[in-house]
């Protein structure tokens, strides 16, 4: 039972970190997610959620750096690529974001990532991001 329990600790830290994020307890979330990342360096999930904590605070440049660091190790993680695009949209970098979103949709590797990318792309097209305006081509 000891080894089986120990193997679950990183997953539990990720879940607790995500829960703290949803509750707005961002410092607690970051501490839990960093612990999970240290125990599971091969898993992009804790660091992707870490980027979400920065995004939640409006620290879009820090979220971007965090997502890019994840993608340096996990280049095809389309969910992280979608969150990166969201951080670019928040920084009004429409062209970069739209290209990234389209690449996620075109790759079609991860259903949740594709749905998120399509939703963000549709919002850009409808001009829901201030200053983005509808696409002209």
Segments predicted by a language model, with ranges:
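Alpha-helical segment of the N-proximal tetratricopeptide repeat
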Residues: 7-35
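Start-of-helix register in tetratricopeptide repeats
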Residues: 11, 45, 79, 112-116
């Amino acid at each position: 039972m000891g080894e089986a329990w120990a193997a679950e600790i990183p997953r539990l830290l990720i879940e607790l970190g995500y829960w703290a994020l949803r509750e707005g307890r961002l410092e607690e979330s970051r501490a839990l997610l960093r612990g999970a990342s240290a125990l599971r360096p091969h898993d992009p999930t804790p660091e992707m959620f870490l980027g979400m904590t920065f995004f939640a605070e409006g620290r879009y440049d820090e979220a971007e750096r965090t997502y890019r660091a994840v993608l340096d190790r996990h280049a095809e993680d389309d969910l992280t690529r979608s969150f990166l695009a969201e951080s670019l949209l928040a920084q009004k970098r429409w062209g970069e974001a739209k290209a990234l979103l389209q690449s996620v949709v075109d790759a079609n590797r991860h259903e949740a990532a594709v749905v998120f990318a399509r939703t963000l792309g549709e919002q850009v097209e409808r001009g829901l991001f201030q200053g983005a305006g509808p696409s002209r081509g």
